[in-house]
């Protein structure tokens, strides 16, 4: 409900001295982030800041009433999602100053740190935490953000974490999860992992850049608010770990432990899976797009592979709506193998079923790739090769043969059907 507009006095912030101060800053960019550009500071029609309330938020903003209420709805929906993920209901109202035009705000009405971040086109979350006997007994956060879509949600994730856990975790987790919270559209449910819904500039930047290693992201001395580019890498890692079933079961407990200051680390949690995570992380960076689902593109590290023979060929069932799947076959470079296929699949809800040869455009064709370890012990892939309805093929490398239905990686979800593949010498 909208209340009467009021002038926000700076005296409140003079009393907002804290026992412990935690500051987390959102990404600031004047060029790459189209939805987080510098706030227009040119003269504008007067729009005195007003207060708008919902169950979990109090926002002071110069946005028009309709836009302010829409923002409240988006914030409340996001809060349901993140509180469900972390299994911790919000404890207290999150207060936000959301600025559309600085010209509408009287001098001194914004905290200097908040105003500085808003001037730069980003935002900041200031939190105070009160301890007693080493235990957190109270926490309060205030958000300052531009009204550009995305920044208030990002900062609200920081505020929620600070108020409910007393901290936001290390930078890679704090900023990566804040970007995830901003991008989440639906409550995560078992069996229905999240698809990629980030901004287009994130995809374009990552796909065109030299990847940052896991070590660079997790163990660097980067600080919050450093660059929008670093935020992209942190989001990518958190999205992979949170939505890929190979790693998600460990990721949520790790995050909760980081938020509650338990003696844990990324290396302790995933040390035994380092090679696999590094491989899937780089694979994700090369192939993701809007709609990409890590659960459908996860790699199978559990299936046992062995060499086939002419008497008993190895059989596998390859689903159309998944990425590379285990054939169970170990192949040797240069050797020929017999292959047969049975069944049909399709690559869209309304498309016709096709065999392993695919359609006229090549979609739906049975494809192969070989996974092997290089001299450094890291996983690598051969060039993908077409199998279709062939009755023989030559292995391009020695290793584990994986198969899939050819389709765009971010469009697998609407595929259906499966093909049985038998391979022998």
Please name every model-derived segment.
Residues 1-17:
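Bacterial N-terminal signal peptides that target proteins for export
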Residues 14-26:
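Bacterial N-terminal signal peptides
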Residues 30-34:
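Boundary at the C-terminal end of the N-terminal hydrophobic targeting segment
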Residues 36-45, 114-143, 147, 165-295:
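Acidic/His/Gly-enriched intrinsically disordered linker/tail segments
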Residues 49-68, 136-138:
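Acidic/histidine-rich, surface-exposed loop or edge segments in extracytoplasmic proteins
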Residues 63-106, 153, 163:
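Zn2+-dependent metallopeptidase catalytic core
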Residues 144-157, 161:
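Short alpha-helix carrying the canonical HExxH Zn2+-binding catalytic motif
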Residues 287-425:
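Gly-Asp-aromatic-enriched flexible segments
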């Amino acid at each position: 409900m909208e209340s009467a507009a009021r002038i926000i006095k700076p005296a409140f912030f003079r009393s907002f001295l804290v026992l412990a101060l935690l500051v987390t800053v959102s990404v600031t960019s004047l060029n790459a982030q189209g939805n987080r550009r510098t706030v227009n500071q040119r003269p504008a029609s007067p729009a005195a800041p007003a207060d708008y309330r919902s169950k979990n938020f109090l926002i002071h903003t110069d946005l028009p009433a309709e836009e302010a209420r829409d923002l409240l709805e988006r914030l409340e929906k996001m809060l349901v999602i993140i509180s469900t993920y972390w299994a911790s209901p919000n404890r207290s109202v999150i207060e936000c100053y959301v600025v559309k035009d600085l010209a509408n705000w009287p001098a001194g009405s914004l905290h200097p740190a908040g105003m500085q971040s808003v001037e730069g086109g980003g935002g900041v979350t200031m939190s105070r935490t009160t301890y007693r006997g080493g235990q957190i007994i109270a926490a309060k956060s205030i958000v300052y953000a531009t009204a550009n879509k995305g920044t208030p949600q990002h900062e609200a994730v920081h505020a929620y974490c600070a108020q409910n856990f007393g901290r936001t975790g290390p930078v890679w987790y704090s900023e990566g999860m804040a970007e995830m919270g901003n991008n989440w559209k639906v409550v995560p449910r078992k069996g229905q992992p999240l698809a990629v819904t980030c901004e287009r500039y994130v995809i374009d930047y990552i796909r065109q850049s030299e990847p940052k290693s896991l070590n660079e992201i997790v163990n660097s001395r980067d600080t919050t608010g450093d660059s929008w580019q670093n935020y992209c890498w942190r989001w990518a890692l958190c999205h992979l770990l949170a939505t890929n079933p190979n790693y998600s079961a460990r990721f949520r407990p790790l995050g909760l432990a980081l938020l509650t200051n338990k003696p844990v680390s990324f290396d302790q949690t995933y040390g035994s899976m380092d090679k696999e995570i590094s491989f899937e992380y780089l694979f994700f960076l090369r192939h993701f797009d809007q709609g990409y689902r890590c659960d459908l593109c996860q790699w199978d590290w559990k299936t046992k592979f062995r060499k086939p023979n002419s008497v008993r060929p190895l059989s596998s069932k390859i689903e159309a709506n998944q990425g590379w799947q285990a054939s169970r076959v170990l192949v040797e470079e240069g050797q020929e193998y017999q292959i047969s296929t049975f069944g049909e699949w399709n690559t869209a809800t309304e498309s016709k079923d096709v065999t392993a040869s695919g359609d006229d455009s090549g979609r739906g064709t049975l494809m192969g790739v070989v996974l092997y370890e290089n001299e450094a012990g890291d996983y690598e892939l051969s060039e993908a090769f077409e199998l279709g309805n062939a009755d023989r093929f030559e292995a391009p490398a020695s290793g584990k043969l994986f198969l899939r239905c050819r389709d765009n990686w971010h469009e697998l979800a609407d595929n259906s059907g499966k093909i049985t593949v038998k391979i022998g010498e």
